């Protein structure tokens, strides 16, 4: 009987990908970056389906989420970025959003990459960060027992303004599962303190992971 009471608390995370990847050769370092408004990318079908990243074209299995999960991701990213790169000059918020909206509406025929490049150029930034949420499924239940665990998929890109190159990519795709289902996930188990986490908590874990390889300053 006691074993049955303990099992719901032994939880880890099942994941497909959890990485931050510096793409080009050589060291990438910026002093001033702009953070464009993060976006939720949802499939046309309400039950979910495949979508493509607006920047790199990679395919993700996505589901639409209520609320504004893109704002959650952007907030957590900015908080962690300030902690990890305190000397980095970051432009964010309405200042960037206003420029982004204007350039997007005035330039309907250009690609998303070109829009971001123009945004960065106008703001005097060397790089522009863009983030996309593909899945933000909240847990159904409470911290010690759930009907359905939290599941999160997101991707963050860093674009170099001078040539439009995507110089860094951080991707996170994770669904929490019991430790009994996957005994190799002790690290996630201890990070989550042996409980079923919320989608925001899982997103925070992902942001922390991908920012480990985010380019530094010159």
Language model region names:
Residues 45, 138-143:
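Extracytoplasmic/secreted cell-surface and envelope-processing proteins
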């Amino acid at each position: 009987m006691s074993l049955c009471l303990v099992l719901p608390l032994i939880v880890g995370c099942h994941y497909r990908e959890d990485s931050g990847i510096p793409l080009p050769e050589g060291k990438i370092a910026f002093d001033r970056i702009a953070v464009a408004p993060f976006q939720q990318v949802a499939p046309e079908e309400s039950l979910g389906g495949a979508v493509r990243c607006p920047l790199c074209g990679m395919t993700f299995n996505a589901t639409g989420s209520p609320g504004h999960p893109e704002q959650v991701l952007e907030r957590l990213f900015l908080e962690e970025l300030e902690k990890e790169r305190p000397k980095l000059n970051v432009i964010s918020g309405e200042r960037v959003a206003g420029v982004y909206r204007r350039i997007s509406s005035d330039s309907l025929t250009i690609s998303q990459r070109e829009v971001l490049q123009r945004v960065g150029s106008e703001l005097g930034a060397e790089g522009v960060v863009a983030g996309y949420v593909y899945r933000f499924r909240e847990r159904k239940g409470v911290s010690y027992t759930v009907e359905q665990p939290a599941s999160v998929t997101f991707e963050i890109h860093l674009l170099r303004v001078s040539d439009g190159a995507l110089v860094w990519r951080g991707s996170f795709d994770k669904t929490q599962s019991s430790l009994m289902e996957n005994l190799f996930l002790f690290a996630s188990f201890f990070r989550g303190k042996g409980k079923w986490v919320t989608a925001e908590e899982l997103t925070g874990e992902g942001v922390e992971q991908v920012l480990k390889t985010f380019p530094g300053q010159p």
